[in-house]
From Swiss-Prot:
Organism annotation: Danio rerio
Subcellular location: Cell membrane
Xref: Pfam families: ALK_LTK_GRD, MAM, PK_Tyr_Ser-Thr
Region (Disordered): 635-671, 1313-1334, 1389-1420, 1492-1530
Name of the gene: ltk
Subunit structure: Homodimer; homodimerizes upon binding to alkal ligands (alkal1, alkal2a or alkal2b).
GO MF annotation: an example: transmembrane receptor protein tyrosine kinase activity
Function field: Receptor tyrosine kinase required for the establishment and proliferation of iridophores and their progenitors from multipotent neural crest cells. Iridophores are the blue-tinted cells that reflect light to give fish their metallic shine and which, together with yellow xanthophore and black melanophores, generate the zebrafish's stripes. Following activation by alkal ligands (alkal1, alkal2a or alkal2b) at the cell surface, transduces an extracellular signal into an intracellular response.
Active site: D1068 (proton acceptor)
Amino acid composition bias (Low complexity), ranges on this chain: 1400-1413
Transmembrane segment boundaries: 852-872
Name the UniProt record assigns to this protein: Tyrosine-protein kinase receptor
Family recorded in the similarity comment: Belongs to the protein kinase superfamily. Tyr protein kinase family. Insulin receptor subfamily.
Effect of inactivating the gene: Complete absence of iridophores. Fishes do not survive past 6 days post-fertilization (dpf), possibly because the swim bladder cannot fill with air.
Modes of activity regulation: Inhibited by ALK inhibitor TAE684.
């Protein structure tokens, strides 16, 4: 039953969908094919077809008929046979076939005898015609006759008849003898008809007469193609729009020959670059061929103040030109300028070269012009001139007699010593016929852009949509307005047609003719101001204002579109370019405390130009609407001004208020309406032409910094910004203050207009203007209306709850009200409509308020539904995320998988652009991208801060096709946005460095995932590991010497000096961050990790509350107390680095926690010298540790003192200390990752020094030397066998607590206050948990990530310190902290161990939460248990900022595993839930998990799962989370 019901609903839905689709299709078809209400209206193409008759189809021409049979017959050559073949055509004219039809005149004899001698053909009515309208027809009349053929034009609304002359245009040469007759009609603005008449009064006079192909050509306005007139040859002349022809040689010769100027318009803009150049828009590609040439682009206005000119013509020359000043006293004897590469010419008949040359003075030399063809051995000389000329321009025209194949023009001037002359070059043109023969086709492409003020159709209510005219700057910018050619190109294919003024105050002003009398809404947009060199966050916006004006047909509106003020950057020369890049601060340094200029000036932005719309009355301009321009920004942003500070825009509407220009100071004020200013840097008023001001003289003379104001009165800039143009110009600061912006101009609305939109500063670029036919909605109730697209009528708009009445004016509330309105206006004899009842919607107040039960039911159902959906969504998200992470961990766990996973992908990157290095902005485009195909990964080196680090090869980096060994840092594909930003920032930082003691960034590969950073391969590893590995020991001598240690210190000092000189603060100079090129004696130490610098520069502040790690033991007091980081911070860190080097890799401040180090350093304490440290070296350390940063030496001084040490025999001959601690294998073992992990959970080993601990939970060892901290593991099931590893070695004696004095009297190191290394009695179990950590380290290029988990929390610490004793048999307390302390992780055990001060050193008690008792397998002198230990596994996550947990793959095992069978005894305590790891006697198997220990910290912001409780003490790792310190953001 349900199935049948569903089928029914489906069929019903399909039926409804089909009906709706059919209805929509009918509506769309009706919309696409509208019904024309006037059948007489047709398109121009249809009119052209109607006026053409070839008699192959029905013809619209009317034929005379004086008899019932008719006088004209349509026939063909096959149908009409004659006895004489030469008296009839063998084919028609239109088709050229014998089957084609033509019109034959064959009057009857009775008609001729009646005296009717006239026969005619009349065209259909033509509404109007263009200037090239003409009649064309074909006639066949083989024998001369007395009959006469004529044509005339008759206007339909009058009796006037205008005869037109028929002339023979062409005649077929074959026997068909068809003649083509043509008569010019011309432009007619009234409807007319054309009549062709033949007069003959006898059959003999008629003879055989046939017509074909009657056509009115080019008579319909708007034809895309216009045939040439009869007096123009298509391929040898150009037809002007208004009639007449000019020769092709005169096209594009800088002389306007056509009345409308089309011969110098769009055609010339299509010519190749450099072939038509007046130098008004730039050099057009004409450049000096050598850098020593003196040719330069100038204008006549720029030469007015030049007193060294020899003549006056150049000063009076308008526009720009190339200028060469010849002065024979110098070494220069020639100058050369050449054009850009030009294409091949296609004709040599009408091709000619024309240019204007000026040469005046005592010139002992020659000026020559040559053509250099591509591939030619020598240039072809086409013109040469020497001698003396007058002080005037000479126009030179040269014919190009040969077809050139790819060439350029070259103008050379040679002179001898003693010459003194001025030479100028202007208006260079190769005629358009050189490159294109179809000039008329090029011209007709621009016909929609007629330059005359041809009236547009008057807007009416029947138009489909309001007409809009949009005016722009025509692509021009700067202080001068556009040209006619620019506006013609910009308004192409639009309805805008303007004439641009060329001279005087109207230069650059666009003139537009109002097409119809109506009310227009005019909107004006002022231009924005320019940006300052270092004040480019936000520009001053131009003002938008709109008003309505009544305009009459034929009115001329003058529109000046404002140009944006020029930005100060990029600079015009290398010095200003450096200032823009932030590499130079000469302007800030050259200003007084009050902000006034001392020497340097420039760098401000120019003022924006205003947009003026006005018209002429009695020869004087009358402003209608003025949108003010924005002021220019100063060189620097005012720190006291708010970024969001805004001012209320104002406007003036009183014409009696004078439109003065803004006040000018060091920068130029904005131009007003009718003011006059003599300052060149002030913006000109509109009556002066509205040109933008130039830069202040100081900026031009010192820095050559030219920053102009925009066209429209924008003021020129200095260090302060220029004022904006307007009705009243914006003021500029009186003093050249580097942070004083120019003010905006004042807008204006004429009282005759009505404000439509209040002014608003919103324009961010050049100005604009919009003119729209305004819809008058005053008759509507809501004062708002629109134009209906179907009826073309204006319809009033009603509110959402109202309906428009049939009168299209009134709004009725409901259908009931509408019905009442209709009945009210019905006639008396009409029956009223039955109105529907007034329906009140449910739930309204008519039904009363809803009940409380209903409200509660709705609320409860909503809440329940929301909770259910929320829970379901969260559950789904949780399981999906869990499964996804599990899959990702499995896939990305192996480094070999990443080796094979190279997949193409597009990089999407974002970074903070506000921070740069070495004064330069950081950009990803500066990184050297290496194609992925050139990179080969060889093997994995380790895991770094982001991902795996590989050794690889890259091709093509050294200029040869040889492979370069590199280290490759990778960023996993699946990572957070912060990791990606950190990765890119580290690449940007390292790419900026170029020094022999800083690891070099070879390149990057960011376009394909995973992303790579290619670094210099450092095979020697990090310095800390190298020093620890090469310590001299009792049975092992070291190859290191004191001189080699000094060389390593010198190498790092060289790198630090490079960073210091470039004002770069490293923030973490330490041995762990220094790498060695090789382990041999030729090693070079380099700085290789910029983790902290990356974190600082990646964000705009130092995150105090984040999880960033701070190297406390390497930081000076002002850094961790006040958050101040300077170059002196690195000096302090370098002192600690020296201590590390000469202690051979020990942790600074031994046995001190971070908090103790803070108190120790701030209290004035400093570390003692390492053992065997030479005195001069220790003095360098203490000088680096001066409390006052100013007293610390810079790295140049440090380098000098290190060099002195290298030359001191007492220093370099000092022997290195011999260590009697553990063998080297315990410090540098490799990590062995077993295949299986088991299911063990690591637990904390709670150790107590108390002798009165519970004997059931303790095991006493009789051999204190063998006591080791062990890892207690909890197993959910009993295991019978385990794989264990052991290494019987002695712990170092320097990390153990000593209960009695004198036990730890280090012979070469005295710790301040003689504090033992034991934990205080206040240390809690949670603190011990925090002190146990896991170190993850990339041996060569990685960063450190330290993390441990315990009871839902993690901690970051380190376990390295200095040895306190050299006695290998010293008693070791298991609760002590050594340099090789085993990691211990607490999972769910509650441990509370507080050893008393009197704990015996010879006995250790391990107290777990619960542990079953075990018997020693040996049962000998002590308890020796085979511990149950499994290897922890290191979880590898796909991102750099990850948490690392312990599992079976994180410990180092012995090469020979020992399988020990264990039997687990049941626990006698109900609380015993975990197994115990015991300690063994000497000779028994001792399982000691070994972990690589190196001092570092995690550069990434390591996130812990939960927030741990605040510990009382920290491990002596040297690092602390930033949230534990009071760090001021920097």
């Amino acid at each position: 039953m349900d199935y049948i019901t569903r089928q029914t609903f489906v069929k019903l839905a399909l039926f409804i969908f089909t009906v709706l689709r059919s209805s929509c299709a009918l509506l769309e078809k009706a919309a696409e094919d509208p019904v024309h209400p006037n059948p007489l209206q047709s398109s121009p193409a249809e009119d052209s077809d109607v006026s053409f008759c070839d008699f192959e189809s029905p013809c619209s021409w009317t034929l005379s008929s004086h008899s019932t049979g008719g006088d004209w017959f349509i026939t063909s050559a096959q149908q009409h046979r004659s006895s004489r073949r030469d008296t009839q055509p063998i084919r028609d004219y239109s088709t050229g076939k014998s089957e084609g039809h033509f019109l034959l005149l064959k009057p009857s004899s009775s008609h001729l005898s009646a005296g009717r001698c006239s026969f005619h053909m009349t065209s259909p009515v033509v509404l109007s015609s263009g200037p090239f309208c003409h009649l064309q027809l074909a006639r066949f009349q083989p024998e001369p006759h007395a009959g006469n053929i004529s044509a005339f034009v008759k206007h339909t609304d009058s009796t006037d008849i205008k005869p037109i002359d028929l002339t023979i245009k062409e005649q077929e040469s074959d026997s068909s003898q068809w003649e083509v007759l043509e008569a010019v009609i011309g432009q007619l603005n009234e409807p007319f008809q054309v009549t062709v008449q033949y007069s003959a009064c006898s059959s003999h006079e008629v003879g055989f007469l046939a017509f074909d192909s009657l056509e009115l050509k080019n008579c319909v306005m708007g034809d895309d193609y216009v045939d040439l007139g009869s007096d123009c040859e298509k391929y040898s002349s150009l037809q002007c729009h208004s009639g007449g022809c000019i020769e092709k040689q005169r096209v594009c010769d800088f002389h306007t020959d056509c009345p409308e100027g089309e011969d110098e318009g769009l055609i010339c803009s299509t010519l190749p670059l450099g072939s038509y150049c007046s130098f008004e828009l730039g050099s057009c590609g004409w450049l000096a061929a050598d850098t020593q040439s003196s040719w330069r682009l100038v204008s006549g206005q720029q030469l007015i103040e030049d007193t060294h000119l020899l003549g006056t013509t150049l000063k009076n020359t308008q526009g720009h030109f190339l200028f060469l000043k010849v002065r024979g006293h110098g070494d220069e004897r020639e100058a050369l300028v050449q054009s850009p590469a030009l294409p091949s010419t296609i004709s040599n008949q009408d091709c000619q070269l024309q240019f204007s040359l000026y040469r005046y003075g005592d010139f002992n030399g020659t000026v020559l012009l040559s053509v250099v063809e591509s591939g030619a051995s020598a240039p072809a000389l086409i013109w040469e001139r020497s001698g003396h000329w007058k002080d005037a321009w000479q126009e030179i025209t040269l014919p190009i007699t040969e077809i050139l194949n790819g060439f350029h023009l070259k103008v050379q001037a040679f002179w001898t010593s003693g010459s003194k002359a001025d030479i100028a070059l202007d208006d260079i043109s190769l005629s358009a016929a050189c490159f294109d023969t179809e000039l008329n086709e090029l011209l007709h492409e621009g016909l929609p852009h007629d330059l005359d003020f041809s009236p547009l159709p008057e807007p009416s209510a029947s138009e489909a949509s309001p007409i809009t005219w949009w005016f722009t700057s025509c692509g021009a910018s700067g202080p001068f307005g556009p040209t006619q050619a620019q506006c013609d190109s910009a308004y192409r294919n639009t309805n805008v047609s303007v004439v641009v003024g060329k001279e005087g105050p109207l230069r650059g002003v666009q003139m537009w003719k109002v097409p119809a009398t109506n009310t227009y809404k005019i909107s004006a947009y002022g231009a924005a101001g320019g940006k300052g060199a270092k004040n480019h966050n936000k520009r001053s916006h131009g003002v938008f204002i709109s008003a309505t004006f009544p305009l009459e047909k034929g009115d001329i509106l003058y529109i000046l579109i404002g140009h944006q003020g020029e930005d100060a950057c990029p600079g015009r020369n290398p010095q200003t370019h450096k200032i823009c890049l932030g590499e130079s601060s000469v302007i800030e340094d050259g200003f007084d405390s009050d902000g006034s200029a001392l020497k340097w000036a420039g760098g401000g932005g120019g003022g924006g130009g205003a947009t003026y719309i006005y018209r002429m009355e009695n020869g004087q301009p009358l402003p209608l609407l003025i949108a003010a321009g924005g002021g220019g920004k100063a060189y620097l942003e005012d720190p006291e001004s708010s970024q969001d500070q805004s001012f209320r825009e104002q406007y003036e509407n009183d014409t009696t208020v004078s439109g003065v220009s803004g006040r000018s100071g060091a920068a130029g004020g904005g131009g007003g309406w009718s003011d006059v200013s003599s300052l060149s840097w002030a913006g000109k008023s509109l009556v002066e032409g509205g040109q933008g001001g130039s830069s202040c003289p100081e900026a031009l003379s010192v820095l050559g910094w030219a920053t102009f104001g925009g066209f429209g009165g924008g003021g020129g800039a200095c260090s302060a910004g220029g004022g904006g143009g307007g009705y009243r110009g914006g003021d500029a600061p009186l003093l050249d203050d580097i942070s004083a912006d120019g003010q905006d101009g004042l807008s204006f609305v004429h009282p005759m207009g009505k404000i439509f939109l209040q002014p608003l500063a919103a324009m961010e670029s050049h100005g604009e203007a919009e003119i729209v036919v305004y819809l008058n909605c005053s008759h509507c109730k809501t004062q708002s209306c629109k134009r209906d697209e179907d009826t073309k009528l204006i319809l009033c708009l009603c509110d959402s709850d109202e309906v428009l009445a049939p009168d299209n004016v009134t709004c009725a509330g409901t259908k009931h009200s509408l019905c009442q309105f209709i009945n009210k206006h019905l006639q008396h004899n009409s029956s009223p409509l039955v109105c529907p009842p007034l329906v009140v919607p449910m739930g309204s107040l008519a039904d009363g308020p809803p009940s409380l039960v209903f409200i509660m039911a709705v609320i409860v159902s909503t809440v329940v539904t929301g909770v259910v959906l929320t829970c379901a969504s969260l559950t789904l998200i949780y399981y999906r995320k869990k499964n996804h992470l599990h899959a990702v961990r499995i896939r990305l766990q192996s480094p070999e998988y990443k080796l094979s996973k190279i997949r193409s992908s597009t990089i999407m990157t974002d970074y903070n652009p506000n921070y740069g290095y070495f004064g330069k902005a950081a950009s990803l485009s500066e990184l050297k991208e290496v194609p992925r195909k050139n990179i080969t990964l060889l093997r994995a080196l380790g895991h770094g801060a982001f991902g795996e680090v590989y050794e690889g090869q890259v091709l093509g980096m050294n200029g040869e096709n040889t492979a370069m060994q590199v280290a490759i840092k990778t960023l996993p594909e699946i990572c957070s946005e912060q990791d990606e930003m950190d990765f890119l920032m580290e690449a940007l930082i390292m790419s900026k460095f170029s020094h022999q003691n800083i690891v070099r960034c070879i390149g990057v590969s960011l376009q394909i995932l995973p992303r790579f950073i290619l670094l210099e391969l450092m095979t020697g590893g990090d310095m800390k590991s190298f020093l620890r590995l090469n310590r001299p020991r009792t049975n092992h001598s070291s190859s290191l010497s004191m001189l080699e240690l000094l060389h390593m210190a010198r190498d790092i000092a060289l790198g630090c000096r490079y960073l210091e000189e470039n004002h770069f603060i490293h923030r973490d100079i330490a041995a762990r961050n220094c790498l060695l090129t090789c382990p041999g004696p030729d090693r070079v130490a380099k700085i290789g990790d910029f983790g902290m610098a990356r974190d600082i520069y990646r964000a705009s502040y130092y995150r105090k509350g984040g999880r960033a790690m701070l190297p406390v033991k390497w930081m000076p007091p002002e850094a961790f107390l006040e958050g101040i980081f300077t170059c002196k911070t690195d000096t302090w860190s370098f002192g600690v680095l020296l201590w590390e080097i000469f202690s051979l890799g020990y942790m600074p401040y031994p046995c001190k926690t971070n908090q103790e180090v803070l108190e120790f350093v701030t209290g004035g304490g400093r570390m003692d010298p390492p053992k065997s440290c030479p005195g001069p070296v220790y003095r360098i350390m203490t000088q680096c540790w001066q409390h006052c940063p100013e007293h610390r030496p810079n790295f140049t001084t440090i380098l000098e003192r290190i060099n002195y040490c290298t030359q001191d025999p007492d220093v370099i001959n000092t022997p290195l200390p011999v260590e009697c601690g553990p063998p080297v294998e315990e410090e540098g073992g490799t990590v062995i990752r077993p295949d299986g992990s088991g299911s063990m959970t690591p637990l904390l080993v709670a150790r107590s020094l108390s002798q009165d601990a519970s004997p059931r939970a303790s095991i006493t060892s009789v051999t204190p030397q063998a006591l080791k901290p062990r890892l207690q593991l909890q197993r959910p099931v009993h295991l019978t066998q385990e794989v264990g590893t052991y290494r019987e070695t002695l712990e170092p004696c320097w990390a153990e607590p000593v209960p009695a004095s004198g036990v730890c009297p280090g012979p070469w190191l005295q710790v301040p206050e003689h504090r033992p290394c034991s934990r205080s009695s206040s240390s809690s179990g949670s603190q011990k948990l925090k002190n146990k950590t896991k170190n993850l380290w990339n041996p060569t290029y990685g960063s450190w990530v330290l993390e441990s988990f315990g009871r839902g929390k993690s901690a970051l610490c380190h376990t390295q310190s200095m040895p306190l004793s050299c006695n290998p048999t010293s008693v070791s307390a298991p609760s002590s902290t050594s340099e090789h302390t085993d990691p211990v992780v607490e999972v769910n055990a509650n441990v509370s161990a507080s050893p008393p001060p009197s704990a015996a050193p010879s006995q250790t008690t391990l107290t777990p939460t619960a542990a079953p008792s075990r018997k020693s397998p040996t049962g000998a002198a002590g308890v020796s248990l085979a511990t149950v230990m499994d290897l922890a596994k290191l979880q590898s996550f796909p991102c750099g900022n990850v948490n690392y947990a312990y599992d079976e793959q994180s410990y180092e095992t012995e090469s020979l595993p020992v399988v020990v069978s264990k039997s687990l005894e049941p626990s006698t305590s109900s609380a015993a839930t975990s197994s115990l790891v015991a300690l063994s006697q000497p000779g028994s198997f001792t399982h000691k998990p070994l972990v690589k220990r190196h001092a570092s910290y995690g550069h990434e912001d390591v996130r812990r799962y939960t927030q741990p409780e605040k510990p009382t003490r920290d491990r002596d790792s040297g690092f602390s989370l930033s949230e534990d310190l009071s760090v001021t953001p920097v």
